[in-house]
Regions:
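Conserved Class I S-adenosyl-L-methionine
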Residues: 49-75
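Core SAM-dependent methyltransferase catalytic element
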Residues: 68, 84-109
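A short SAM/SAH-binding and catalytic strip from SAM-dependent methyltransferases
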Residues: 1-18
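Soluble non-cytosolic domains of exported or imported proteins
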Residues: 14-21, 52-59, 95-96
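Mature catalytic domains of secreted/periplasmic carbohydrate-active enzymes
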Residues: 23, 66, 71-77, 96, ...
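A short glycine-rich, Lys/Arg-flanked "PGG" loop and its adjoining helix->strand segment in the class I
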Residues: 18-33
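Conserved beta-strand signature within the Rossmann-like core of class I S-adenosyl-L-methionine
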Residues: 34-43
Length: 109
């Protein structure tokens, strides 16, 4: 089993972190033991409200996933060092090439 959550977790998290947690918990019920959720989203600035920029901090996503009971692994595959995280993801200068985290959330066996 696999589910992909692509660049949407911030939309659940920023207005209400509990809403994002509930989404992950609901997705978890759809997975067999050992099933995975792939999560990618735009990296935000630590200690800042990232909602206007449509971003979130990587650690926020990891904390949510662990709180939902997933085993979490991360990858640097989608990192983009030219993105300074201070612009909206819709800023034309970024050309949608944002710095993104990539997480593998696995439902325990």
């Amino acid at each position: 089993d696999a589910v992909i959550v692509a660049q949407t977790l911030h939309d659940y998290y920023n207005p209400n972190p509990d809403r994002a947690l509930n989404m992950l918990l609901q997705l978890k019920t759809l997975l067999k033991p050992g099933g995975v959720i792939g999560v990618t989203d735009h990296i935000g600035i630590a200690g800042r409200d990232n909602s206007d920029m449509h971003r979130m901090q990587t650690q926020q996503a990891i904390d949510l996933a662990e709180q939902a009971g997933f085993d979490v692994e991360s990858s640097e595959l989608l990192r983009s060092p030219s993105d300074d995280h201070s612009r909206s993801i819709f800023d034309p200068r970024l050309n949608r090439n944002t710095d993104r985290f990539l997480l593998k959330l696995q439902k325990p066996l």
